[in-house]
């Protein structure tokens, strides 16, 4: 595999110098690299056949696909073919073959599109001589950041980044980075095959299903789109931080406020500094994960409304579509809880009374402290487990029929790994009762799955193997967490269930958390 990657690097450098990416679609090693990446990133509890991958890559199918792609005339004419629905985009009457071919192309095309971005990142790092670790941010850094900063802020804007209405917007974004016109036209052909993708992108449930089939390509396009959205925010934030306080800024802001909606571009050109002066805030923070972001500030409510107004207008002028301002909610932190990264977070006020003794006089001083409180959402977690067929909507455990063909050790391993990931990710919750309920659901669902496989009842099955049969598997995670916590602070044994532990060895968020 290392030799294949080295050969691919030489070929990519040659095509990159010529600014041609489309010929890489006709190279066999591209599809081998795409298959290697996709197979190693599968979700542990997900059947391989759902994603359409096998544990072996078929070189024969790749050769046939490349042969059909050489016939560009038939490929382009298939767009206007009246029998396209019958024969499929790739000339297959078999829907499975057509789906498999399009899936191979989309995964390979995603690898090709990442070449200009990866080479540009490496070259910029080499020029600036900055280590890569300082330019990357893990999702685990978000939790300590919110815990340290959010309790000192006043307002938060909870916003959802809308998906582009038309897919041509995604192509136009890539035009700024990729100069290969045939590759962009081929991307349009892929979009034409999924003519109903517009409804898929606007549906959260459909994104979850669709991302498992074309995950790498469309997450790459989505990240490129989000990057452009964040670029405008960072531009305004950076420019406003350089400005000084101008006394005449109040007059300019009041005069041209009502004309900004109709003459936004003119106002930005003529009075850009006066606009940015009113957006100046040294205590503003921005956090994003996927399509959800948080904009927190220590300023006033009017300042947050101005940020919302200008961000929406700049985004609409740049992307040329309505950005749905109702998706941005401005709330005051002590009175508002928001959902982010699988937690319900809020800022709690804790009143404290301190006795101050001075000589013969004593005083009682009332103080108020703020603390970030994070709670695992039990309703959304049960809903996610219900969609995965581990329990009912009300939280009653049920068996997993699709896993009855596996061995007993595989069934136990899958249930324990799901519980371990959920337990570790939500270990920062201030209320541990949610984790105990998740453990109960998965433990009983595992017992019912094993009993169904052996054609027995749960009571008979557990009586035959003993009541401690499942405990040794599910107690392993709790014991590991207890040992880690006791090594750090051994004198807080009585408060173990109240403490929050940010478990920072998670490679990726579990899909049950990610799409809840």
Swiss-Prot record:
Disulfide links within the chain: none
GO BP, sorted A to Z: mRNA processing; RNA splicing; tRNA processing
Localization in the cell: Plastid, Chloroplast
Keywords from the named record: Chloroplast, mRNA processing, Plastid, RNA-binding, tRNA processing
Matching InterPro entries: Domain_X (IPR024937), Maturase_MatK (IPR002866), Maturase_MatK_N (IPR024942)
GO CC annotations on file: chloroplast
One MF annotation (Gene Ontology) recorded for this entry: RNA binding
Role, per record: Usually encoded in the trnK tRNA gene intron. Probably assists in splicing its own and other chloroplast group II introns.
Similarity comment text for this entry: Belongs to the intron maturase 2 family. MatK subfamily.
Protein name: Maturase K
């Amino acid at each position: 595999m290392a030799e294949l990657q080295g050969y691919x690097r030489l070929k990519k450098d040659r095509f990159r110098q010529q600014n041609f990416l489309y010929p890489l679609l006709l190279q066999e090693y591209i599809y081998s690299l795409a298959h290697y990446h996709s197979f190693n990133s599968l979700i542990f509890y997900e059947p391989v056949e759902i994603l359409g991958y096998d544990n072996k890559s078929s070189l024969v199918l790749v050769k046939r696909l490349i042969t059909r792609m050489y016939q560009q005339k038939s490929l382009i004419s298939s767009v206007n073919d009246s029998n396209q629905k019958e024969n499929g985009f790739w000339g297959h009457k078999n829907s499975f073959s057509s789906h498999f071919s399009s899936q191979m192309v989309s995964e390979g095309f995603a690898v090709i599109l990442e070449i200009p971005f990866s080479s540009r990142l490496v070259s910029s790092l080499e020029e600036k001589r900055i280590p890569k670790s300082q330019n990357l941010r893990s999702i685990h850094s978000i939790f300590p950041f919110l815990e340290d900063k959010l309790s000192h802020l006043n307002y938060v804007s909870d916003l959802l980044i809308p998906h582009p209405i038309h897919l041509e917007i995604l192509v136009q974004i890539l035009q700024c980075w990729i100069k290969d016109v045939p590759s962009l036209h081929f991307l349009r052909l892929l979009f034409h095959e999924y003519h109903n993708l517009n409804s898929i992108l606007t549906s959260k449930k459909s994104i979850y299903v669709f991302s498992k089939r074309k995950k790498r390509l469309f997450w790459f396009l989505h990240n490129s789109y989000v990057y452009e959205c964040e670029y405008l925010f960072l531009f305004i934030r950076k420019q406003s931080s350089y400005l000084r306080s101008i006394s005449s800024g109040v007059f300019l802001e009041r005069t041209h406020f009502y004309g900004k909606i109709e003459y936004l571009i003119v106002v930005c050109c003529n009075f850009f500094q006066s606009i940015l002066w009113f957006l100046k805030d040294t205590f503003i923070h921005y956090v994003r994960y996927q399509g959800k972001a948080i904009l927190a500030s220590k300023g006033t409510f009017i300042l947050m409304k101005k940020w919302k107004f200008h961000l929406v207008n700049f985004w609409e002028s740049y992307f040329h579509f309505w950005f749905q301002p109702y998706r941005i909610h401005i709330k005051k932190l002590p009175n508002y809880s928001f959902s982010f990264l699988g937690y319900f977070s809020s800022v709690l006020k804790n009143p404290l009374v301190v006795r101050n003794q001075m000589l013969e006089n004593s005083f009682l001083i009332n103080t108020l402290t703020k603390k970030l409180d994070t709670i695992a959402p039990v309703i959304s977690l049960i809903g996610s487990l219900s969609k995965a067929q581990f329990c009912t909507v009300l939280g009653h455990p049920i068996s997993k029929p699709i896993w009855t063909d596996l061995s007993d050790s595989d069934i136990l391993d899958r249930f324990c790994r799901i519980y371990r990931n959920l337990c570790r990710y939500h270990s920062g919750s201030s209320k541990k009762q949610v984790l105990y309920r998740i453990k109960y659901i998965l433990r009983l669902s595992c017992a019912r799955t094993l009993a169904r496989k052996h054609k027995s009842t749960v009571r008979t099955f557990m009586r035959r193997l003993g009541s401690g049969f499942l405990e040794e598997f599910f107690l392993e995670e709790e014991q590991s967490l207890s040992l880690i916590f006791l090594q750090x602070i051994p004198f807080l044994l009585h408060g173990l269930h109240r403490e929050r532990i940010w478990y920072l060895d998670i490679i990726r968020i579990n899909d049950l958390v990610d799409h809840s």
